[in-house]
Each structure stands twice: as structure tokens, then as C-alpha cells.
Amino acid sequence: MSRRTRLIAALDTASRSTAQDWADSLKNDVDAIKLGLEFTYACGLDAVKTVSAGHELFLDLKLHDIPHTVASGLTALAPLRPALTTIHASGGSEMIARSREALESAFPADTKRPKLLAVTVLTSMNAEGLLDIGVNATPQEQVLRLGKLAISAGADGLVCSAHEIAPLRDALGDEPVLVVPGIRPAGSASDDQKRIMTPGQAAQAGADWIVVGRPITKAADPVLAARAIMEELASA
């Protein structure tokens, strides 16, 4: 299956003006922007709406609570009209199913519903980190377990590292949307990410979207950094 891997710029900041500057400067050079916990908690939902205007929005709040609370939270977030939004797969099948129902209720059939993405294993986690929280499995084993559960419960796709793309495609096929953080261009610092790949490697593996933050936003010229990644994706 031929797919174009698209680029999400992660605007991870607590500053509304900084996020707005990044969003404005990157408008023609990325496919979407990500606003997550740091920005949303610091600046509020009105700021999310303003900064994301003119962009496809990946609203990455990773909701994880009892099913009713998560479903209600997604209903409250619906006016932001994100293209993609996240919950934790470890919340279980009922939470995922109720989340899907909430989005379908908030977005009638003739409107574009946000894609519901289930976060599997954070890209900062490795086998040792999983064992610390009582999971005696490799990251790949846990991603596959949670990925199968999430898709069967109604998630549209998954957030996973690039290392799990191939086994997920083998297990679940081409339909689930795979969004891949932990992307670092060659020569970039890995920071707190442990399971990383380059943009080109992730595209070749079959990612639908890649998420890149600090290699863009902390670059001397964020626009040039984003363009270089887009060129790498196009040639992958």
C-alpha cells in the first residue's frame, strides 16, 4: 500500500506567543501541529483554538480515566475540531469504546470526526521501565497487546514508536492510522526518547504521521529544519 507520511510539528511550550510564532512561521511547511499538555494547561482551550487556526490540529492530551470521564472530556474538547486526538490504550476496552461513541455523537456523519488514537507504550519507555510498572513484556509485545485491544474496541489508530510499525501492520493491516513520535533526524540529540528513528526510516516502515518537536522548534531556523524533514519524507 502506497502512503504519504505526513509531518506534525510538536509545539511544546507554555508560552502562547512562542507557540503562535511557531504556528505562523511553519504554516506552509508542516502538515499539522501538535498541542499537548504543557501548552493546554498553561494557556487554556481558547489559546489552543487560536494558535491552531489554519492548521490541522493534533490535540495530544492522552486522556486516561474512567470511561464516563474520558468520554465527557472528549465531548468538551469537540469544539476545537482536532484532526487527531489521544487517549491511553491502557484505559481498557470500555474506555476506548465510550470515547469512540462520544466523538461520533459530537460529530454527525456528514462532518469530519477526529481520529481517535490510542497511546500504546510511551517512546520514553524501554523494557526496564515497563518492568518497573509491573509489565513483564518487551515494548513490542506490550504495544501489540494494547494495539490489538484498542483497534478492536474502536480506536482509529495508535501512537507507537517507529520500531513497532512493522509488527503492527502485520497484525492489524494497513487501515489503522499510525502516529509515530520519537523521531530524530540524523545527528539530532535523542533527549529523553529511547526508541527512536529518523524521518526517512519511519516513512519507509509505514508511518502515517510522524511527530517532531525539539529538532524543529529548537533549531536555529525552524522553517528550514521542517523543510529538510519534509524533503526527507518525500524521498523516502
UniProtKB/Swiss-Prot annotation:
Residues annotated as transmembrane: none
GO BP: any one term: 'de novo' pyrimidine nucleobase biosynthetic process
Main EC class the enzyme belongs to: lyase
Chain residues that bind substrate: 12, 34, 60-69, 123, 184, 193, 213-214
Active-site positions on this chain: 62 (proton donor)
PANTHER family from the UniProt entry: OROTIDINE 5'-PHOSPHATE DECARBOXYLASE
Name used for this protein in its record: Orotidine 5'-phosphate decarboxylase
Gene from which this protein is expressed: pyrF
